Amino acid sequence: MATGPRYTVPMRRRREARTNYHQRLRLLKSGKPRLVARKSNNQTKAQLVVTGPQGDETVASATSADLEAFGWEAPTGNLPAAYLTGLLAGKRAIEAGLDEAVLDIGLNTATPGNKVFAVQEGVIDAGLEVPHNEDVFADWQRTRGAHIAEYAEQLEDGLYSGDFDATELPDHFDEVRERVEDEL
């Protein structure tokens, strides 16, 4: 006679599609701080997290909304903003005393040229040691936003109107990148 169900219910955070526990365990066994990169349509977040007996502790963090303090006027959900967010988080992590990390992309798909890899590239350019494969990074012109500027030039006037002229994105990216590197 049957005594109960033959299945096991996944852990709550796995059911909610928030945590991959197998991946988390592998990252924790490395003993290095984790570079937690998360993306959405509107912004990118980067955190450097150290795991201890009392739980995870965020040592340094940055969001793409923080870029406004450095003069960023373009939208914050694109690839150039993700790179600059990683650069800012990396600079803050170095100030906090970290020198290495391992990338934690969570449940994001590891697609080459993805925003999470742009965050990783920014952190590496800031001076942190992060194990990586150069093949997953986007082309530098794409990271600067040249593809967005080319698309904006193809459109008719008025279709891409807003507060920021997207045709000037690569130059604006270079200006903000210099400010982030100089001020921290």
UniProtKB/Swiss-Prot annotation:
This is one of the proteins that bind and probably mediate the attachment of the 5S RNA into the large ribosomal subunit, where it forms part of the central protuberance. It comes from Natronomonas pharaonis (strain ATCC 35678 / DSM 2160 / CIP 103997 / JCM 8858 / NBRC 14720 / NCIMB 2260 / Gabara). This is Large ribosomal subunit protein uL18. The keyword RNA-binding applies. One of its GO terms (molecular function) is structural constituent of ribosome. HAMAP family: Ribosomal_uL18_A. SUPFAM superfamilies: Translational machinery components. Part of the 50S ribosomal subunit. Contacts the 5S and 23S rRNAs. It comes from the Archaea. The lineage of its organism: Archaea, Methanobacteriati, Methanobacteriota, Stenosarchaea group, Halobacteria. InterPro entries: Rbsml_uL18_euk. GO terms for biological process: ribosomal large subunit assembly; translation. Keywords: Ribonucleoprotein, Ribosomal protein, RNA-binding, rRNA-binding. GO terms for cellular component: cytosolic large ribosomal subunit. Belongs to the universal ribosomal protein uL18 family.
